[in-house]
Design a protein with these regions (language model features):
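Non-catalytic terminal regions of proteins
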Residues: 2-217
Length: 217
């Protein structure tokens, strides 16, 4: 994200950050080389503009960080939700559109929910300020893995520029077989005290936060 406001890294900030991760042997999954090109977010394969979410269409209460009203926030959320769940675009955000084809292993997908939408700002070293609109969308699905049912949460963070163009979609995929396997292994192993099995389905136990913060008691 820093590369959006300082493309050349002339102060060596990003290189120093990556070097510190390499030195400690901390590497992101599926990244073969710890280089700037390998770890930076990639834009969508196709150019997408969301109607009604360009800055000229937004209403503010004086400051760009303050929406004009709750109704304006709802309007923005509806515009985002309608776009990302459109069957033409849903795959780009790794969401399941209403009545859309389910990914392999998924037997049911709940409607996607826009959890938040807000303006962000970042200051460049030369004093410029970069504005974006950031929306968070979640979706839950039920996976059937060898007769065992459990829910997997997914969704995406959508970064939209002042012209309403989608700059980034950072997502969690439902159709990742490795992710499904890792979650099932965790529910049966190190996280089993948070889950119970009812018939074929794994379900979260009551008072999960209390169990989490209460240690092994």
């Amino acid at each position: 994200a820093d590369g959006d406001i300082e493309r050349t890294d002339k102060w060596g900030f990003r290189e120093a950050l990556m070097r510190s991760f390499r030195r400690r042997k901390i590497f992101p999954d599926h990244v073969l080389f710890m280089t700037e090109d390998a770890v930076r977010w990639q834009p969508p394969a196709e150019s997408m503009h969301i109607k009604g979410l360009a800055f000229r269409d937004l209403e503010f209460d004086g400051d760009p960080g303050q929406p004009a009203s709750a109704d304006e926030l709802v309007r923005q959320a509806h515009a985002l939700g309608k776009f990302v769940t459109n069957p033409k675009h849903a795959e780009c955000f790794r969401l399941v559109a209403p009545a859309g084809k389910l990914p392999t292993g998924v037997i049911q997908a709940s409607p996607a929910l826009v959890q938040s939408i807000r303006v962000t700002r970042r200051a460049a070293p030369d004093g410029r300020v970069l504005f974006d609109l950031v929306g968070e969308v979640t979706q839950s699905c039920t996976v059937d893995r060898k007769g065992v049912l459990y829910d997997v949460n997914g969704g995406c963070t959508v970064v939209i520029d002042p012209e309403g163009k989608v700059r980034y979609s950072i997502y969690k995929k439902f159709d990742s077989q490795q992710r499904q396997e890792r979650q099932l292994a965790a529910m049966r192993g190190p996280l089993k005290r948070f889950w119970k099995k009812s018939g074929r389905r794994f379900e979260l136990r009551d008072n999960v936060l209390r169990r989490l913060h209460g240690g092994n008691r």
